């Protein structure tokens, strides 16, 4: 066979030489014919249009500069056909012009690859082939002039991954199951060299007849033996397509661990009909064709740069290649030197780390995922990531060890999951267990206080034996515990619960995750159930279910009782209301006075003509008495209109006073202040003043958000943060408070506000950073999809709403019904303004008294001496009396003494003394009733001023005339009454006559 291939290649080379001599290439290659200040790298383009366009786009990028002012020129050449003769002619034409140091090719079939390797070795010119894995085949001894870069995963790399898995599981006896492999013996040899151990069985399925019977019969050799053992530990399936691999795995007998060696994408992984625990490889981040071409060009450029620095004469004068006269260039030729530098070049390219292994294989960085077929708690198959392989290093996922190993077929045992939680009200509460260490209500959970996996395993083992100390036993209950119990019931699994050791949600510290995230990554728990916020950083390392609770971040502050200012008693009513009330009072008093004086029945001289008058001052006194509800003696209006207006004013005052009284207690007792924050963008948070402190919970989602969004704010609040939410609330409510504001999940803050007995807490500002709570699981856990599905069902059925109503239906502050014994007390500081007002009233009373004396001694005499402003009865009865009567008693006595002269000059006659007393009585009576007369009558001429003056005789005559006139009127009235009684038959007519006869006799 090898001889036939050699003859075929020789014939192709001969045809190429003949064609070169006779007529040359039918189309010009476009390669420059002379060398200049540049070296050339030729590229034989692929035949497929899409691949050709991608290669041209990659070659269009600027080429790197070389030392000594050299430049690398890229020349693209397209060959019309891909037969061996045309390929040989095209390659010879590419290499013929001077300056071409290497070429890049894209073989699409194995014969092309063999021809390129033969031509590279024959012409001693480096040829770099970018190929797919399907083109690869053992080509005999490698040559340094033909370098191969596998765009897809090379077979050697896949075998390295499989060997790493075999060694990690300590599998000794291995069986190779081959589907369609062109050189099975070469593959077995390659496996033996990589694994350092030959496989125990090699099953070639390519020679089998079509049908499942023959396939099952062949694979039965790997099944379980009669004694219960298996002939091999693992079976590796190679060279199979996705459909063929599915057929083989469906027919595989139970027993060995199956490994699928063909890399598959995640979406192509089947789930049904496969044996549990089968391992599958999946390449992630496969390099693109453009990246592979770019790295090949950079490989040549770096090798040329190194060669130009060490051997500039060879880099500046590359020799031309003549396919008609092939001569060995010797060890010092440019091609051999470049090949040597190519095999010793390595760098970090677009595909990752690039290096040449074995002088002909160009390796790039590869990354594989290892997937395993597991079973979820419902028993359904699901793929889970158990490890990853990169650059020869196999790493198992941290949570892979925690995943449940598939139970044997036919078992019905309920799986048992380990759940980690964190105490956060109202989602998770804890209380002490009973005397027996059990929980009548809630779920038994451990509080180990450590994150050590061995310690946890030992405690749960001791829990089954009943030997765990009671101090570590707790009873967990709450929102999330109810949700977990419902999930366990619907998904048919059991769980064991423990509280996270460090009490943290989880953050990246010194390259390691802490808290709940750390427990999931370390495999200590299958899931984390609490108020676990979903954020981008956590989602990169663990999986989350769909959120079962939506929330955001909020700010909580504390209210403070402050001393009421002096004018606090006026707060129940707005200043405009106060002005309106007193304006209405004076206006009502004015209308009461007008209605009373214009009414024929009013308490005025023209109305009822009594001893009292309803003036404006009386109306003001009445309106103030009604407004403040004081019971004092006051004049009331007598006219119906005035009475109606007075009652209407009383209704107005009742409503105003009731509103004032109702609001007074709320305003005075509820006088509280708090930090007004508009939200996370408030200047108080971004530029805090001296003494303003705020914080959050360490390693929580709130801290992660603030740290990523506002680094300066996080630097200030870091030293004021708390380990837990209750601790932060305690810092906020302490006396004196250690925090002015506390930032955390709004759902947690709302609960703390609702249970605050003193009503000192409240949330302020706009919510921000909308987030949700989900159940955390290891990456690619088979539980994620099932849990998310059931959570969605709970939302639709209303179960989530029932949980919210159960744990969040608290009575908020301001709407609570206080106990009978609980009273709202107001101290002196609440009504300090009233005391100040009373003191001001006492001071103003002194000023009023001073004003009275000023009016009495200065203003009143001036008005009395004038002729105007003598009628004040409608305004004030007191002022009117003072103006329209004689001098006061003291002044009158002094005036009488002045008029009478010395005592010894006045005779003390009894008649004169008696007459003086009568005169004084008349004067006093006149002073009491004189205001009832008209102004003209009241101001009549009374000539007497002194009792002993010259006007006594005139006064006596006037009095006698008045008495006589009165007697005449009385006599006429009595006569008329007698006539009327005579008509009625009354015999009492003589009585008035005696009165009339007695009157003249007395006179």
Curated annotation (Swiss-Prot):
Extracellular side: 25-574, 662-832
Disulphide bridges: 439-475, 445-476
Annotated segments matching region Disordered: 883-912
Pfam families the UniProt entry points to: Lig_chan, Lig_chan-Glu_bd
Protein's GO biological process: calcium ion transmembrane transport; protein insertion into membrane; regulation of calcium ion transport; regulation of synaptic plasticity
Binding-site list for glycine: 531, 533, 538, 701, 745
Region entry Involved in the trafficking and surface expression of NMDARs, spans: 952-985
Localisation per UniProt entry: Cell membrane; Postsynaptic cell membrane
GO molecular function: ligand-gated monoatomic ion channel activity involved in regulation of presynaptic membrane potential; signaling receptor activity
Cellular component GO terms, alphabetical: endoplasmic reticulum membrane; neuronal cell body; neurotransmitter receptor complex; NMDA selective glutamate receptor complex; postsynaptic membrane
InterPro entries listed in its UniProt record: Glu/Gly-bd, Iono_Glu_rcpt_met, Ionotropic_Glu_rcpt, Iontro_rcpt_C
Coiled coil regions, renumbered to chain: 947-986
UniProt keyword terms in alphabetical order: Calcium, Cell membrane, Coiled coil, Disulfide bond, Glycoprotein, Ion channel, Ion transport, Ligand-gated ion channel, Magnesium, Membrane, Postsynaptic cell membrane, Receptor, Signal, Synapse, Transmembrane, Transmembrane helix, Transport
Substrates-to-products reaction catalysed: Ca(2+)(in) = Ca(2+)(out); Na(+)(in) = Na(+)(out)
Amino acids binding D-serine: 533, 538, 701-702, 745
Transmembrane regions: 575-594, 642-661, 833-848
Parts of the chain in the membrane but not crossing it: 616-627
Keyword match Transmembrane: yes
Entry-linked PANTHER family: IONOTROPIC GLUTAMATE RECEPTOR
Protein family according to the UniProt entry: Belongs to the glutamate-gated ion channel (TC 1.A.10.1) family. NR3B/GRIN3B subfamily.
Assembly notes: Forms heterotetrameric channels that contain at least two GluN1 subunits and at least a combination of one GluN2 and one GluN3 subunits (in vitro). Forms heterotetrameric channels composed of two GluN1/zeta subunits (GRIN1), and two identical GluN3 subunits (GRIN3A or GRIN3B) (in vitro). Does not form functional homomeric channels.
Cited function: Component of a non-conventional N-methyl-D-aspartate (NMDA) receptors (NMDARs) that function as heterotetrameric, ligand-gated cation channels with low calcium permeability and low voltage-dependent block by Mg(2+). Forms glutamatergic receptor complexes with GluN1 and GluN2 subunits which are activated by glycine binding to the GluN1 and GluN3 subunits and L-glutamate binding to GluN2 subunits. Forms excitatory glycinergic receptor complexes with GluN1 alone which are activated by glycine binding to the GluN1 and GluN3 subunits.
The name this protein goes by in its record: Glutamate receptor ionotropic, NMDA 3B
